[in-house]
């Protein structure tokens, strides 16, 4: 199958947080707002001349400095971000939108603030730490609305003169929704028996939409969509099984590439930095202010296991089962970042519930942040692929009898 025209360019954009499009936007007077978590409402970080950059730590090798300030049994994703901050990799930012969702991420951003990782010449720079509720009722919506208004919108308005009006929020939602529509249309093609795009390629497209200014990446995404619409696919399928990947932070498309190299085509991506739920459209009505609707959407659509009330747990399990059905996956791979508190119990519970209650075959793994060409992970995925094939073979033989 022919390689996408802009794929190499997109891959190069993912080589550095301060990539070419980020530098271009800042040179034109735009403001880069860093964030790490779905719970920091992305669309509200793209008001006026602001643009969001979801932080990653590509090519991380050592985490020795970050481990000194945190702990060797804390989340490696958070330590990798702190390590890069200590190296000065995020000094291009104009603000950092943190969330008090998980302890490790919270500690990493607190260390960045204490040690002035933004540099000494940014008087208007601000850190914020949103207090995120554990559920999704209307009291929780009102709480997060107050948090966002006071900790993000107010300093953007007072420090940088950013328009935070209802009209500005609706304009940001329209731009956000166009990105979502493009990626959703591309993602829906993965339901086909022979998709015109691999899971790796789709992961690259989704990641550049998180890490680049929307106004600069949108023309390239539009062009890529048109290209994929007319792409000629190979007549023979080049995979053995189809899988959905569920879990925590996958900000490295090479992990998806590793899974696919074992014969498992990734057809659904329900993980942090994936398209579910982060690349689903936000529908706004005229009957209520945009800010409240945006806050409600993020609170009610989160897939984070931090929300531990029973109806939220069932919501997440049902959604995985729905994705497996819709994208005709043969199984699901649940992955978690090593030492992640919330996903450690979500993954273990799902490993029991999904096969028992939903009939979905599951591979459950915890992994380090730096995956590379992990032989152990490759072996486990290969074994999972073979187990699915054996199950299909037994079912076929049973039908013949």
Predicted regions and their residues:
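Acidic/His-rich segments in extracytoplasmic proteins that coordinate ligands and/or metal ions
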Residues: 80-155
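Redox- and metal-dependent alpha/beta enzyme cores, enriched for Fe-S-associated oxidoreductases
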Residues: 27, 38-39, 44-56, 247-312, ...
